Amino acid sequence: LVSSEMCIRDSNYIMKNFNLWLGIGGSLLITLPVQAQKKTKEKQPNVIFIIADDLGYGDMSCYGAHRIQTPHVDALANSGIRFTDAHAVASTSTPSRYSLFTGHYAWRRNDTGVARGDAGMVIRTEQTTIADMFKSAGYTTGAIGKWHLGLGDKTGTQNWNKKVSPGPEDLGFDYSCLMAATGDRVPCVWMENQQVLDYDPSAPIEVSYTQPFPGEPTGKNNPELLTNLKPSPNHGHNQAIVNGISRIGYMKGGGKALWKDENIADTIIAKSVGFIERNSDKPFFLYVGTNDVHV
C-alpha cells in the first residue's frame, strides 16, 4: 500500500513540513504538516500510515532480521527514512492508537487501557484528531483494519444490529472498515462506516463481556468444537466460539457477517486498495491497522 507520492520520499520536505514521531513495537505517532493551512501550488502528498501490533525492532530484515525477510518494508526503508532511535508511547493496542490519533499521552487518562470489544469510544468527540487536521487541509480520510478504540457512547450498550455511534466519522474519518476491537475479541464482524458489513438479519447480534448466552457453546465447555486453536484460559480465550476459535467475550448471532480469520489480511488489503483507487485524484490520508503479527 504505497502511494507514488508518499510524504516519506524526501528528507528535506519532511524536515520542512512535518514533525514525526515513530514508535516501533506496536505504536507509531505522526503529526500533521505544520503548513497545512497554507494554500500552495505544490500537490499535497498522499499519506498512508500502517501500524502493526507486537512488531519488534528486530523483526524486519531492514533492521537486520534473518529468519524472516520483509522485502516490501525494506523497499519503503530504502526509498524513505529508516529510524534507528525511536520510542513507543505505549506497548499495547488501545493506548498506542489513542496517542496516535490525538497526540496526547494515554497515561494522562485512566480509561485508555486495553479496551473490551464492547467498549464505548475512548476518544471523545470534542477532541481534535489527526483525521480532523488532515480534513482541514483538504484531505479525504480513511481508517481500515484493527480499531480497538471502542464504538458507541457507553461500554456494553451498543446495538450491533444498527449503526453504532459515535464512531470514526465523529473523529474526522470519511470512510472506515474496521474490526471493532481485536481478532481474539468479539464481536467478530467487520464494521463498515459503523454498521455491520454484510449484516445478516436472520442472525441478530448480541455481545456480552459479563455473562454467556444460554445455549451458546464456549471454548471452556465445548473444547471439541475448537477446530483451529485450543483455548487459553489464562488469557480468557475460552469464551464464545467463532470460526472454530474461542474468543474473549460472549457473542451470539452474526450469521453470514462473521469473519473468517484466514481472510482478515486479504480484507484489509482489498478495502485499503479500494479506498486508494477511489481517491486517486485527490489527496488522502489512510490509517491501516494490520491484524497479522499480533500475538
Enumerate the predicted regions with their spans.
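Short, small-residue-biased leader/transition segments that mark boundaries at the very start
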Residues: L1-I8
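N-terminal secretory signal peptides that target proteins for export/translocation
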Residues: R9-N17
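Short, low-complexity, intrinsically disordered N-terminal modules
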Residues: S11, L32-P33
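Formylglycine-dependent sulfatase
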Residues: K16-N19, I24-L28, V34-V295
